[in-house]
Amino acid sequence: MMEFILSHVEKGVMTLTLNRPERLNSFNDEMHAQLAECLKQVERDDTIRCLLLTGAGRGFCAGQDLNDRNVDPTGPAPDLGMSVERFYHPLIRRLAKLPKPVICAVNGVAAGAGATLALGCDIVIAARSAKFVMAFSKLGLVPDCGGTWLLPRVAGRARAMGLALLGNQLSAEQAHEWGMIWQVVDDETLADTAQQLARHLATQPTFGLGLIKQAINSAETNTLDTQLDLERDYQRLAGRSADYREGVSAFLAKRSPQFTGK
């Protein structure tokens, strides 16, 4: 069986590489299944404290492999909603709920579901040559993989509407200028920059980082009062963590903290 997802764990970081470079790492059913299995390991293994997602070859991900669907323009219409519900929705939900930082290193093109997958990660670093393409409208489709929820939040309504309706390429530099991604780096430094950041996050108070992630995600739909209540509850949990005690002890002793992620 082909390895469509390459998995490597080192220094608390799991690096998952989308590995169908001949198809620009576009998704097929088996690739989805392999990625789901890898995410199970991230969820269950407390020694993995950061997830890094990237692509092999000259692109990050071109979205869904249309050849894999065997669509016959003259035949019965496929149920694309079922495909989205079966594969993409669980993926996006799992990444959003994962109580660990998720970094995406975007090399080359990120198109369709590949673009929304990348932008849905917690921190996005892109190579200078990277391009984001909301290609759905070119096929008469609706942005999926969380795209219609995500785009207005990372780009604002006007830009989200333009990106979705026009389906034009968006450069990494422009995405950074619009605040959609964290950082743009030279192509040759992308892998090292992303790994360095992932390894740093893997040494930090993972439990607290997970609470931060969930709080910020919840703020998108919460009222101020609801969010204040959530901050209170999460701060209570964080204050009971071993990492909080270690952080305070290290501060008072003027030494570097040794967080365990708990």
Task: Give short role names for the model-derived ranges.
Residues 1-56, 93:
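Conserved CoA-thioester-binding segment of acyl-CoA-metabolizing enzymes
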Residues 2-3, 249-262:
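Terminal low-complexity tails and localization/encapsulation signals of metabolic enzymes
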Residues 49, 206-213, 257-262:
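C-terminal capping/lid region of NAD(P)-dependent oxidoreductase domains
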Residues 55-94, 110, 223:
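Glycine- (often His-adjacent) and acidic-residue-rich active-site loop
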Residues 93-209, 232, 236-241, 246-249, ...:
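Crotonase-fold acyl-CoA enzyme core
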Residues 213-222:
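Short, charged, surface-exposed hinge/linker loops at domain edges
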